[in-house]
Amino acid sequence: MAEAPTELPPVDGTPLREPGDEWIIEILREIKEEALKHFDPRLLIALGKYIYTRHGDTLEGARELIKVLQRALFTHFRAGCGHSRIGQTRGGNPLSAIPTPRNMQ
């Protein structure tokens, strides 16, 4: 199997490209849409607020939220989500161990 060629810096000396802002935002929209099908919206709002207070409105915050939601969905599916063909027949909410903030019911 041939190795993929390494990316070289552009001739004009600009840095190597990163995934575009639009790509990260699109991935976040998709994973958030999927998470809303499986988790309590209040929990997702609390998670979003927590990450926003840590990272603000930055791409780093978006990446962190993507990472947490991916892990939560993976764990949920492996435990046996009722909507999924992965894992067993039923699964619990892996985020239920996170305490609900006092001002949320």
Swiss-Prot record:
Entry protein name: Protein Vpr
Keyword Cell cycle: yes
Principal cellular location given in the protein's record: virion
Keyword Transcription: yes
Function: Stimulates gene expression driven by the HIV-2 LTR. Prevents infected cells from undergoing mitosis and proliferating, by inducing arrest or delay in the G2 phase of the cell cycle. Cell cycle arrest creates a favorable environment for maximizing viral expression and production.
Spans annotated as Disordered: 84-105
BP terms from Gene Ontology: symbiont entry into host cell; symbiont-mediated arrest of host cell cycle during G2/M transition; viral penetration into host nucleus
Keyword line: Activator, AIDS, Cell cycle, Host G2/M cell cycle arrest by virus, Host nucleus, Host-virus interaction, Modulation of host cell cycle by virus, Phosphoprotein, Transcription, Transcription regulation, Viral penetration into host nucleus, Virion, Virus entry into host cell
Name of the coding gene: vpr
Subunit structure: Interacts with human UNG.
A cellular component term, taken from the record's GO annotations: host cell
Localization terms from the record: Virion; Host nucleus
Gene3D superfamilies: 6.10.210.10, VpR/VpX protein, C-terminal domain
Chain positions with Phosphoserine modification: 84
